[in-house]
């Protein structure tokens, strides 16, 4: 009986995942994640925010006051809202009132009927060199944790003695366990490289990727795609999410969502492909207008005559296992088949996979070529992206054979 129950649960999870993937087709915009970054003054909150989400996310004076005690940082091109607690000095009587107000604000949001309006995770920052986890600060953490929002303690500025930092983390874990808060995750972070006098090389930044990964595991599924797009630490997470987007389009194509399938080149003005390209670009913080995407599609492409190279092996293209399995219906034929032998929906699915992967490969190369400031120049982005896509299409045509 227990095995049957487990199987039922697995099937239910798979159905929910399928619905989530299919919703990617219809959704217009990425969901915006709300992250509370709390901690006393001097713990490096702004440095942490900028390191994870971009250099200008928490620029001085750019925060919008939500309440007397909370500033909100947002950027129209980045699907994240950061709530930053301001001016906390835990020894003052005034701050104790601030703590109550902050808790009330988060609790109010958490009970909202709009799941996108809630606080989705809390990062509580503690300077690793303070060796202090008691009194008003511990009370504050206990109050915030009691709300039930996913909670992570971030030990910041971890450039000191490794053994001492580890001992401090263990002390925090022990206290948390005694107080029934052992579900709180702890991540050690050095947000920026640090150079000490007499040392030949700086201590490199570390821990940001772990913070992103731990946060993703705790976030509700409906908000994860927005957080992945917003963060700039883990390119592998961005690519994984893009592969899920492509997968949802491949599956939809196999079900017949394309009324008319081009025989040779999909890079024509097609609303569905434009929408997919826009979503893939957003995952890499490359926000492209419909006009820009149309220009990319019209100026990218190769004459493949009657040889549809999108039928080359998914293994050669580096497709994910999930997409490979979806496209593997002609496994016995090894994909060396004529266009006329492939049904319309299957042809559409393979074309979507091919051009989707070509696009994300090109975006990743674009990131390597351009600086952060150059990536804000839309004309430059479009021009360079067209060059990269055409180069990759020619390379892949050669791989498929004329």
Question: Can you say where each PLM-predicted feature lies in the sequence?
Answer:
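Conserved G1/Walker A P-loop phosphate-binding module
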Residues: 2-92, 287, 291, 346, ...
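Canonical P-loop GTPase G-domain recognition
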Residues: 16-18, 159-224
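Conserved protein kinase catalytic core
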Residues: 56, 90-91, 130-133, 162-163, ...
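Short glycine-rich substrate-engagement loop in P-loop NTPases that contacts/grips substrate
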Residues: 63-65, 95-102
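Conserved C-terminal guanine-recognition region of P-loop GTPase G domains, centered on the G4
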Residues: 77, 100-184
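Short loop/turn segments at strand-loop or loop-helix junctions that form parts
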Residues: 83-88, 125-127, 155-157, 187-193
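Helical mechanochemical/support elements of P-loop NTPase systems and associated helical scaffolds
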Residues: 98, 115, 204-207, 351
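Alpha-helical membrane association modules
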Residues: 209-212, 221-402
